[in-house]
Regions:
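Membrane-interface "cap" regions at the ends of multi-pass membrane proteins
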Residues: 1-39, 43-51, 61-66, 77-78, ...
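Extracellular loop-to-transmembrane helix junctions
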Residues: 12-13, 34-137, 257-263, 497-500
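Membrane-helix boundary/coupling elements in multi-pass transport proteins
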Residues: 38, 77, 100-118, 225, ...
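TM-loop-TM module centered on a large, flexible mid-protein loop between adjacent transmembrane helices
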Residues: 83-84, 89-90, 122-133, 205-214, ...
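Hydrophobic alpha-helical segments and their helix-loop junctions in multi-pass secondary transporters
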Residues: 118-125, 176-206, 269-276, 385-399, ...
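Loop-to-transmembrane helix boundary motifs in multi-pass membrane proteins
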Residues: 141-150, 244-265, 269, 277, ...
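Membrane-interface loop-to-helix entry segments
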Residues: 144-202, 254-258, 374-388, 404-411, ...
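A generic transmembrane alpha-helix motif of multi-pass inner-membrane proteins
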Residues: 409-547
Length: 547
């Protein structure tokens, strides 16, 4: 890792503290989640039970955050999931994961920037359709040109190229303003809202009633979509190389921001559902639309539009910081051109990665519809979190050259298969006693698999600084929830995921495997010892502190 870092030419400065990370985490998550995905998930998938969807997604994110935190504390370098998976499952798995995660970042940032156009229009009382124009001849979903979204992406790109500390200060200001608007929305929603809207649609003759109008399936489908809301904490972990005290600051920053944001999401979801029946919610601007539907409070929709605009800007800022650092570390490894890993000597930022991905994001935001982008994002995010949880278990129980990996790999495969069987039974088997029996039997089998592994296979690495509690139960629950939410997504999402993964495999075979910094002189790949790499990264961290 230290050898790879030298490719960048300069080190990133360690300037961030725990409060910076909490601010970056909150800023990165809240804007994208509440103001972009909530309307779609509530109107089309979950109804008022969207609050339960957020709670489930929040639990899943918190468990995944624990896994990220342990890795980030013991491997305090930029790169997040790519770095963690690279030192456990190897470069190929890391490349496929990293490629999908970067695509997730780019598409989610494009989606957020298009959401900014809708809320900015609400804030100043101008329909966003007046700022977008339709190009005939292009397919639906790709025929609305959004120049405002492009301008926002390019402006944020300039800010993150200027400096990380400066970006954090901008984020703190925007996040503080945003939180004030969030409190306004929550208070006004509970004050002006009608609890009957939690169970009664606006048009009961056309839409189902009740708090769970689409049943349990709708709750989990909604949870899968709003999981995009939590991608912000992952961006925080990518900045581990710029944190002053990773052991203390990263656990507080990552876990604290996820917990705070989950509470905010649930409160805002209840507030929105009380203000307006779910079938009358505007999918593109749900909170502004909810206040418009409240008699005498149309003015509040403009206030919400301003607050949402601040939130979307902070989300975009943090996510674009994260995507650039992923690309920087992937460039260090050599699997993509090392040009991407260049650190500017004056700003200490990965300027090439920031500029390239900023332009790529702007290009997608120019013409791609919000719904298309949201469906593309969720599956890749869930896959990456699933891989990190597996990698953490592997790193705790396997030391290459000392212990055999097959017992742990067999357990991970068997538990994933059991989780998949449970998911398929839940999704495909008709309701009834046979379904209940199969679900219970599968759950018992999954618990038995974990318990047998816990009793038979000893841990070979005990974390010295910070570790996930209740190993291997905590990451296993994370694995199960990620698999379950993956099963809630639609078929086209898997087609797109397969396409992107196929392209990534092709790039790896034709270029990356030969150019990698892991490649030996004969072109083969050397195998890294996990503990050795963790030790090497700690030595690098100490050297940076001495400088």
């Amino acid at each position: 890792m230290s050898r790879a870092a030298s490719v960048s030419g300069d080190q990133m400065r360690r300037t961030l503290r725990w409060y910076d990370l909490v601010g970056l985490g909150i800023g990165g998550m809240v804007g994208a989640g509440v103001f972009v995905t909530t309307g779609h998930a509530s109107r089309l998938l979950a109804g008022p039970s969207i609050v339960v969807s957020y709670a489930i997604a929040g639990l899943c994110a918190l468990l995944s955050a624990f896994c990220y935190t342990e890795f980030a504390v013991h491997l305090p370098v930029a790169g997040g999931a790519f770095s963690y998976i690279r030192v456990t499952f190897g470069e190929f798995a890391a490349f496929i994961t990293g490629a999908n995660l970067i695509m997730d970042y780019v598409m989610s940032n494009a989606a957020v920037s298009r959401g900014f156009t809708a809320y900015l229009g609400t804030a100043i009382g101008v329909s966003s359709s007046k700022w977008r124009f339709v190009v005939s001849g292009l397919p639906n979903g790709f025929n609305e040109i959004d120049l405002v979204a492009v301008a926002v992406v390019l402006a944020v790109t300039f800010i993150i190229c200027y400096g990380t500390r400066e970006s954090s200060k901008v984020n703190m200001v925007l996040t503080a303003l945003h939180i004030a608007f969030i409190v306004f929305v929550i208070v006004m929603g509970f004050w002006r809202g009608d609890p009957k809207n939690l169970t009664r649609p606006g048009k009961p003759e056309e839409h189902p009633s009740g708090f769970f109008p689409f049943g349990a399936a709708g709750v989990f489908n909604g949870a899968a979509m709003v999981y995009l809301s939590y991608i912000g904490y992952d961006a925080v972990s990518t900045m581990a190389e710029e944190v002053r005290d990773p052991v203390k600051d990263i656990p507080i920053g990552v876990s604290g921001s996820v917990a705070i944001v989950t509470v905010l999401y649930c409160l805002m979801a209840v507030s929105m559902s009380m203000l307006l029946p779910y079938d009358l919610i505007d999918p593109d601007a749900p909170f502004s639309g909810a206040f418009k539907g409240s008699d005498g409070w149309e003015w509040a929709s403009n206030v919400v539009g301003i607050g949402a605009s601040f939130g979307i800007l902070t989300s975009l800022l943090v996510a674009m910081l994260g995507q650039a650092r992923y690309m920087c570390v992937i460039g260090r490894s050599g699997v993509v051109p090392s040009w991407f890993s260049h650190i500017h000597p004056l700003t200490s930022t990965p300027v090439n990665s920031s500029a390239f991905l900023g332009i790529f994001t702007a290009a997608l935001a120019l013409f791609t519809d919000l719904n298309v982008l949201l469906n593309l994002v969720s599956i890749g995010t869930l896959f990456v979190f699933y891989m990190v949880a597996n990698a953490l278990i592997f790193s705790r129980y396997v030391q290459l050259g000392t212990t055999k990996p097959w017992p742990t790999l067999s357990f991970l495969c068997l538990f994933s298969i059991t989780s998949l069987v449970f998911t398929l039974v839940w999704k495909l088997v008709p309701p009834g006693q046979p379904k209940a029996f199969m679900l219970v039997a599968t759950a018992v089998a999954a618990i038995a698999v974990i318990q047998i592994f816990y009793c038979v296979v000893p841990q070979v690495r005990e974390p010295e600084l910070w570790g996930v509690p209740f190993m291997p139960w905590t990451p296993c629950v994370s694995i199960f929830l990620n698999v379950f939410l993956l099963g809630s997504l639609d078929g086209p999402s898997y087609v797109r995921f397969g396409f992107f993964s196929g392209v990534a495999v092709l790039v790896y075979v034709l270029y990356s495997v030969h150019a990698s910094s892991d490649a030996e002189g004969d072109g083969s790949l050397g195998v890294k010892d996990v503990v050795h790499v963790l030790k090497e990264s700690t030595e690098t961290e100490n050297a940076i502190h001495r400088v």
